[in-house]
Amino acid sequence: MNHIKLIDCPIDVTYAINLISDPSCGASSIFIGTTRDSFQGKKVVSLAYEAYENMALKEMDKICSDLRATWPDLKHILIYHRLGTVPENEASVVIAASAPHRSAALKAVTFAIDQLKSRVPIWKKEIYEGNHDAEWKENSESIRPKKSLSSFNYSVCKVDESRVVSRNLVQIRANDCELKNRVECFFKRKRAEINSCNVIDFKQSNLSSNINSDTEVDVSCARTQSTISKQEQSNCHLKVRRATNRCGPQQMQFRPEYKHELSRLTASRVSTNEVGESLQNSRLHSIETYMGLTSKNNENIINRIKNVENRILLLESTSPEYQHFFEQSCMDQPEKKIKTNKTYSAHELRVYIHRKNKECP
Amino acid sequence: MVFVNMNTSRPVSVDIHVLFFAKCRELSQTTRSVFTVPSEIRASDLLDKIVIQFGLTTIRHNLIIAHNESFVENLNDSIFLKDGDELAVIPPLSGG
């Protein structure tokens, strides 16, 4: 059973222990919080407690539920808290728990007092001897204002109203998660760009000037996996026996033609599926149009999907910094279609109808 | 013909009960008060309004709020208020 109370009179500890004791329990654990008689050299005369009572009881009940969820063995739980004026050295809070074994009882009480100090809306004011001002205390564990869960700092990218914004940029509403994702994609893209530049730089910096540009790729030692072993009776200490480049710019020319391979593999399957093809085609075509891509209908469907995917990845990782992508793309096409939302007055309409009537009597 | 756009809902104002405890109660010199606010508002904006209205600026950075007896854990959250809702201004706790 849960015993929860906010009380105005002294807490009877013996009574509390009796409440939670049970024949089936080998352990009862009790915590008694008492008021101290001094704070920073000032003598405490008394303490005044106040609570947001309904909510405090609710939160205390929640603590009980949490305790039972964590230690299902618990038999009885008691949380009593004093309100009003409490003279020094009296119990202000009593927490007790009983369980078949001591571990659950002891841990539950510790957890409960920590939770109570952080979440139950009760406040304590210390009243001191002499001329010292009374003071509202603050638990270090107390729940504090949290504001920073929204990780995106909107203030760092203020919108410059004066600038003419490209028509291709639209304002979107997105939650933090989406924004974070977009920023991460942008980082990734940037990283990839920098990486590819680095590879090229590395290649060039290793080139001596007398090697002509045709052999450049072959002699580059970027991304090399080599096995080195000493030869018998060799004048040299070390000799390269084998070098394998599994990836890297030197291997570009050896890569299989993925596009070609794909077309070859899927050609037969696509042609047999002619009934569904027109529907697929029209849907894919509308997606392509929407994304500003052009393709021939007879082009391999896998390639077209791949292009769409690439486009999505590009757009996802694109920020205003990448405006040049828009400029070279064909996204400007639908310009003509945009309607002007001109409103006509009744008079204008009448004039228009009149004119039309005249034109075709 | 006249078209009325039903979607552009203007923010509706609601009357809520604001409760003050401990130091907040002393600074605001009241235990509860009726306060008119928009029905949808970010918790931090609501807290700012209350802080200004009730003279709590000295402790504003330590305050949290509880809406209908539940803590609003994150002040960036939007809260949706109805007439008669209870909003408690909660300074740092010191129970135990």
From Swiss-Prot, chain A:
What are the UniProt keywords, alphabetically?
A: Cytoplasm, Molybdenum cofactor biosynthesis, Transferase
Origin superkingdom: Eukaryota
A single cellular component GO annotation: cytosol
Q: Locate the residues binding substrate.
A: 101-102, 117, 124-126
EC main group = transferase
* Pathway the protein acts in: Cofactor biosynthesis; molybdopterin biosynthesis
A single MF term (Gene Ontology): molybdopterin synthase activity
Primary localization class, coarse = cytoplasm
Q: Which GO terms describe its biological process?
A: Mo-molybdopterin cofactor biosynthetic process
**Annotated EC:** 2.8.1.12
Cross-referenced Pfam families, in alphabetical order?
MoaE (PF02391)
What subcellular compartments does it reside in? Cytoplasm
Catalysed reaction, written as an equation? 2 [molybdopterin-synthase sulfur-carrier protein]-C-terminal-Gly-aminoethanethioate + cyclic pyranopterin phosphate + H2O = molybdopterin + 2 [molybdopterin-synthase sulfur-carrier protein]-C-terminal Gly-Gly + 2 H(+)
* Residues in the signal sequence: none
Q: Anything else of interest in the record?
A: This protein is produced by a bicistronic gene which also produces the small subunit (Mocs2A).
Q: How does it assemble?
A: Heterotetramer; composed of 2 small (Mocs2A) and 2 large (Mocs2B) subunits.
Instruction: Extract the PANTHER family matched here.
Output: MOLYBDOPTERIN SYNTHASE RELATED (PTHR23404)
Family listed: Belongs to the MoaE family. MOCS2B subfamily.
Q: What does this protein do?
A: Catalytic subunit of the molybdopterin synthase complex, a complex that catalyzes the conversion of precursor Z into molybdopterin. Acts by mediating the incorporation of 2 sulfur atoms from thiocarboxylated Mocs2A into precursor Z to generate a dithiolene group.
Its name, as the record gives it, is Molybdopterin synthase catalytic subunit
Q: What species is given as this protein's source?
A: Drosophila pseudoobscura pseudoobscura
